[in-house]
């Protein structure tokens, strides 16, 4: 229930109006990777959310981010492509990519742009402001992402909630499914007490890349750390690519299971959409 309330509060801040004029110095394209196969929710990108396919709702939110010059769906499935072509550009990709970054890179080779933002295809309520700040960071950084404070003790030890620690310059030191850092002097305390003692950060699954950085990154094989944690961003850190972490006050509302559809539809109804 607590997560639901936070999600509703966050969703009330999502902007549905027209975007402001862009002021960035690099041309940035948004790419949404979409796969049909899913163990928990096959065909998820085409699931209807209040009458619209999930992938369409993600595209519409991306288009409200003024920093994006274009929004593209990248898929290896003709069923997704057929639907997505009704409302945006589609690029077909190989089905054999080991990560979303590799899929995005295939599309990047065909694009005339300076930067790319990889937006998760299962977040129909993603705040355009989050996309905006990740894209803007590419004016000065080779790679960027976003993080928010962990407030829910249920997320503290959850391996599906990826944690990140950053240095004084706001760049990632490490990402992990384990709780990091380890609070040695508070190890015996409860999760609530540890959250009060240190500003733990939760990684949000959105990535910005300079095009050249992305194309260089995917030349490297899957790294040992990436393979161990199953976190693709660790390949970048392994090879010395700095990742700027933009801190935002945002709680994502994703669609992971079929039952999440009703939750998102309730939030849309609450917002009058």
Predicted regions and their residues:
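A conserved hydrophobic position in a structured secondary element of the catalytic/binding core
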Residues: 75-76, 126, 209, 256
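A residue-level structural signature of the nucleotidyltransferase/glycosyltransferase Rossmann-like core
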Residues: 72, 123, 163, 206, ...
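Conserved core of the sugar-phosphate nucleotidyltransferase
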Residues: 126-223
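Short phosphate-binding loop-to-helix
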Residues: 72, 78-133
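N-terminal glycine-rich phosphate-binding loop and ensuing alpha1 helix
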Residues: 26-74
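Acidic, Ala/Val/Gly-enriched low-complexity intrinsically disordered segments
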Residues: 9, 14, 20-21
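Conserved alpha/beta core of the MobA/IspD/sugar-nucleotide pyrophosphorylase nucleotidyltransferase superfamily
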Residues: 189-273
């Amino acid at each position: 229930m607590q997560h639901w309330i936070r999600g509703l509060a966050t969703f009330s801040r999502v902007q549905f109006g027209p975007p402001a004029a862009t002021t960035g110095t690099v041309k940035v394209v948004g790419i949404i990777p979409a796969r049909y196969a899913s163990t928990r929710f096959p065909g998820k990108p085409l699931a209807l959310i209040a009458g619209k396919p999930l992938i369409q709702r993600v595209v519409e939110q991306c288009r409200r981010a003024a920093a994006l010059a274009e929004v593209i769906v990248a898929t290896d499935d003709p069923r997704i492509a057929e639907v997505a072509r009704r409302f945006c550009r589609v690029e077909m990709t190989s089905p054999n990519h080991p990560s979303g970054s590799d899929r995005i890179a295939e599309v990047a080779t065909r694009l005339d742009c300076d930067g790319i933002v990889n937006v998760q295809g299962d977040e129909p309520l993603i705040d355009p402001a989050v996309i905006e700040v990740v894209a803007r960071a590419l004016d000065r950084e080779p790679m960027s992402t976003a993080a928010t404070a962990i407030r829910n003790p249920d997320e503290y030890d959850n391996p599906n909630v990826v944690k990140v620690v950053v240095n004084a310059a706001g760049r990632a030191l490490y990402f992990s499914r384990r709780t990091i850092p380890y609070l040695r002097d508070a190890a015996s305390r409860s999760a609530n007490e540890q959250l009060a003692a240190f500003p733990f950060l939760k990684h949000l699954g959105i990535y910005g890349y300079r095009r050249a950085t992305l194309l260089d990154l995917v030349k490297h094989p899957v790294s040992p750390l990436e393979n161990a944690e199953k976190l693709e961003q660790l390949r970048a850190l392994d090879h010395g690519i700095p990742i700027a972490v933009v801190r935002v006050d945002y709680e994502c509302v994703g669609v992971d299971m079929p039952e999440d559809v009703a939750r998102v539809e309730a939030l849309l109804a609450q917002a009058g959409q």
